[in-house]
Amino acid sequence: MRINPTTSXPGVSTLGKKIPGRIAQIIGPVLDVAFPPGKMPNIYNSLVVXGRDTAGQQINVTCEVQQLLGNNRVRAVAMSATDGLTRGMEVIDTGAPLSVPVGGCTLGRIFNVLGEPVDNLGPVDTRTTSPIHRSAPAFIQLDTKLSIFETGIKVVDLLAPYRRGGKIGLFGGAGVGKTVLIMELINNIAKAHGGVSVFGGVGERTREGNDLYMEMKESGVINEENIAESKVALVYGQMNEPPGARMRVGLTALTMAEYFRDVNEQDVLLFIDNIFRFVQAGSEVSALLGRMPSAVGYQPTLSTEMGSLQERITSTKEGSITSIQAVYVPADDLTDPAPATTFAHLDATTVLSRGLAAKGIYPAVDPLDSTSTMLQPRIVGEEHYETAQRVKQTLQRYKELQDIIAILGLDELSEEDRLTVARARKIERFLSQPFFVAEVFTGSPGKYVGLAETIRGFQLILSGELDSFPEQAFYLVGNIDETTAKAMNLEVESNLKK
């Protein structure tokens, strides 16, 4: 972190002495720049092209040095469109890597890859900035203690618990509740952990980014009246931007998250949507730089690029960054190098199911497909592990019996199987939960359910103590006590109807 009172356009450091060069060649978003002998910029230094195009319009393009070519030339990748640039234009070496604003001033605001606000809410305090390229924390700084990151969401905490400082892959198509789940996690970490969140939109649709921003304002995650009380910072590098911007926007978001972890000593939630677009942008840049492609046309540095990003997402003795990354799987091929490289870094996977969403069970997290390395007796304890395994066994048996039920009906099942089906259906409904951020749509208040309460509830269902309760009593409630109250209300209502 650098206290930097001298920034030009937000995010570009001018601490170093300005050294001018000239554009020698332009190949799309890639520029070759010639500098005076002995005045060559370093790799990752930020270069600024300032001038006027042929129509007299002002141009300000920031680039990042990627290669030193020899003959006093460097090759740089532009972070914005290169329209209007011409050979011979002056290029300034800022003498430092790209730096972005960090700290409380980022909350409630939307930034681009350069750390410039793009939400028309005025300038941001840029006195405290941090370079986007940093080393991962040293071994001695790491917190190696395995601890569960409680989300207050029953299905996640019980069956696929998140690791504090871990990385979670979020798999889900359109319309299954990915955005609502993301917003609920942002809301819950702020309330239960006193933490903040950073959302990195990497190569996503501009419309989706706008929708997320509007929904966050509606649900109070972003506080319009008092912007400083907001719980999230947003960093966007959309699909229409050059590959350089899409490749670096993840690092911009991560840099903002690192400040909250290292300086403010907070637990931070970092969302990256979509991590595949980070790889895709890297592949485009690699081809533009003339590197030989590797397997399936990806960049030869795929593992290095992924590792340098993922290794910075970790727990230290100061705080933690827990990352939830949306993973697009090209053509549903899990062996594709991009998702395969991502899987190597994940501690847990949360799979959203269209089938559950169609049943109206939200969050539509698939309890059988979602996994976690944390679900071990020595980490979560025997009671939690046993309960989770029994829940999974019951749901798996129900899944196996569904074909028989569809053909022959429930009456053809044995007494034991009928009991299993009844309990599985109650478990399925009890895995649903009203969300705080969905209150404006559903009208029912959100519920945060602690892990101990979650385990107790599922143990009561599995033990058969609640077999007499109707299935409806388990749907969209918080803890098991609410189920009991709902069952009594349903009984009273049915008696009144009689």
Swiss-Prot record:
The gene is atpB. The keyword Plastid applies. It is an enzyme of class 7 (translocase). ATP binds at G172, G173, A174, G175, V176, G177, K178, T179. Disulfide bonds: none annotated. It is a peripheral membrane protein. Its EC number is 7.1.2.2. GO terms for cellular component: chloroplast thylakoid membrane; mitochondrion; proton-transporting ATP synthase complex. This is ATP synthase subunit beta, chloroplastic. It comes from Brasenia schreberi. PROSITE patterns: ATPASE_ALPHA_BETA. Produces ATP from ADP in the presence of a proton gradient across the membrane. The catalytic sites are hosted primarily by the beta subunits. PANTHER family: ATP SYNTHASE, ATP SYNTHASE SUBUNIT BETA, MITOCHONDRIAL. NCBIfam families: atpD (TIGR01039).
